[in-house]
Regions:
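A generic structural signal for tightly packed, nonpolar segments enriched in small/aliphatic residues
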Residues: 1-235
Length: 235
């Protein structure tokens, strides 16, 4: 698809954040990261709509739209990090992606969107990142994940647990960027670590589709400045 050259800016921001950590060498901060990568090509080994894929978490996912490959890849990586996080001290989990066109309609060019699960909201994770971003010119808007955003991904039949997404573009889907976060939480198994669980885990999803920069043009580097300010400078 034309214009997808910048669809890897989420993974690139993870690399950029770690490059910054290598320069600053902050003490008392443990950070682990991964870059979820997938080449969404046609061919004999491609994936197709209506295919049912079992996620790393064991959840059966029916593919609704092959253009939503990013949330599939991130869900498996998040599932692994979720399993490791339960044994860590005060862990915070994040996913970062140029995920939806919907967020561009919602907030306009230049603004990242951050949205928390229940445990992260209790600790005001999104407002912390938003305030840090304001201080360094890396603007964020806070979105809320509602129950409808979780219910939307209910599997329509007995054969699957979840529906990856509908077959409309996110720009034509109400709550398009929040729905994606709800799916990632459920597909990764992170919904088993909410406020009512024995081991709650803080998780925030960052959609940088509107803030990653123009194409063609120079990438913005968002959300690296906000994350450095929030978790290094202000830590």
């Amino acid at each position: 698809m034309a214009g997808m050259h910048r669809d890897k800016c989420g993974a690139a921001s993870v690399a950029g954040f770690f490059r910054t950590l290598c320069e600053l060498r902050p003490k008392g901060l443990k950070v682990r990261g991964a870059m979820a990568m997938v080449r969404n090509s046609i061919g004999s080994d491609c994936y197709v709509s209506d295919e049912i894929i079992t996620a790393r978490s064991g959840v059966r996912v029916r593919v609704g739209n092959t253009d939503a490959e990013g949330r599939m890849a991130m869900a498996d990586v998040l599932s692994q990090f979720k399993d490791e996080a339960v044994n860590e001290v005060n862990p915070y989990l994040f996913t970062i992606a140029t995920l939806t066109g919907h967020v561009c309609l919602a907030y306009g060019e230049g603004y990242s969107s951050i949205m928390d699960n229940g445990p992260a909201r209790m600790k005001k994770a999104s407002t912390l990142v938003q305030a840090a971003g304001d201080a360094v010119g890396d603007a964020f808007e806070v979105s809320t994940i509602r129950r409808e955003d979780y219910f939307f991904s209910n599997g329509p039949s007995e054969y699957e647990d979840l529906l990856q997404c509908n077959n409309l573009p996110s720009v034509r889907t109400p709550r398009g960027h929040q729905l994606a976060a709800g799916f990632i939480i459920r597909a990764s198994g992170l919904d088993k670590h909410g406020l009512d669980s024995e081991k709650p885990l803080c998780y925030s999803h960052v959609d940088i589709a509107a803030s990653s920069g123009p194409y063609p043009g120079v990438p913005s580097g968002s959300p690296i400045p906000a994350f450095v300010e929030a978790f290094v400078t202000r830590a």
